[in-house]
Amino acid sequence: MSKPIQMERGVKYRDADKMALIPVKNVVTERQELLRKPEWLKIKLPTDSSRIQGIKAAMRKNGLHSVCEEASCPNLSECFNHGTATFMILGAICTRRCPFCDVAHGRPVTPDANEPEKLAQTIQDMGLRYVVITSVDRDDLRDGGAQHFADCISAIRAKNPTIKIETLVPDFRGRMDRALDILTATPPDVFNHNLENVPRVYRQVRPGANYDWSLKLLERFKEAHPDIPTKSGLMVGLGETNAEIVEVMHDLRRHGVTMLTLGQYLQPSRHHLPVQRYVSPAEFDEMKAEAMAMGFTHAACGPFVRSSYHADLQAKGMEVK
């Protein structure tokens, strides 16, 4: 077992170093080690990677980050090749250490005051019409980073007046009132916050987070902006059951959420939580049917679905899986 480390500000800690401080340890069993990816999870890489390299170059030029890269998303090649990306603001170091996530943990540096302007210019240069903005958790900031989100939204709209903006926000733990005061004054076009999984496994999957708190965040934003869609996503394969997923879907509807994403959890490294099961495309189709019957206006359900995967198509109600 790794020993706890003394964190230095601005240093990214990953894998064993990141997991050393998690209270619920990941003990991999022989059965879990033998669990193999099914054929439907094999990814075909594009033959032409020039668009991918172009987006990466634009990010590096302006000192920006994408969650696609930082979280090792399996859809990176597809999304970058189609000219889309999910921008991650407030740095690339998270104050949380969720054992399903590949984003680095540590003591983050002070937010870049020029990031909103650089982000807006990059989006204009890329000619994007729909953009997703997310962030690491910033428990070190008094507002959890809410003002930085608002500054980014304002800067993007100033340079790109017709663009649609979706924000995928953290839970603003202990700062909900302050954060919502800011975000309701400068709202996005879609407000997204992921529950990630079912409440029974929260202590293991989302240490430091609270299921009811996350539901309340979604509900309160919706109450302030009834006409703005709220959205949430879950991963399957972390020990939950399909029945528990359906119950979470009911909870989301009871809290006013109308957009849903369901995707397969994939283990980033052997130090992360192991995959407990692989859910078939047919099961995802069944969950989508249940979601639509509950009253969700949009439900993207499939093995490769992530909360920002083809988010522009999701917002239009087009089929995504």
UniProtKB/Swiss-Prot annotation:
Its main location: cytoplasm. It is an enzyme of class 2 (transferase). One of its GO terms (cellular component) is cytoplasm. Keywords: 4Fe-4S, Cytoplasm, Iron, Iron-sulfur, Metal-binding, S-adenosyl-L-methionine, Transferase. [4Fe-4S] cluster 1 binds at residues 68, 73, 79, 308. Binds 2 [4Fe-4S] clusters per subunit. One cluster is coordinated with 3 cysteines and an exchangeable S-adenosyl-L-methionine. GO terms for molecular function: 4 iron, 4 sulfur cluster binding; lipoate synthase activity; metal ion binding. Its cofactor is [4Fe-4S] cluster. SMART domains: Elp3. The keyword Iron-sulfur applies. Belongs to the radical SAM superfamily. Lipoyl synthase family. PANTHER family: LIPOYL SYNTHASE, LIPOYL SYNTHASE, MITOCHONDRIAL. This is Lipoyl synthase. It comes from Yersinia pestis. The lineage of its organism: Bacteria, Pseudomonadati, Pseudomonadota, Gammaproteobacteria, Enterobacterales.
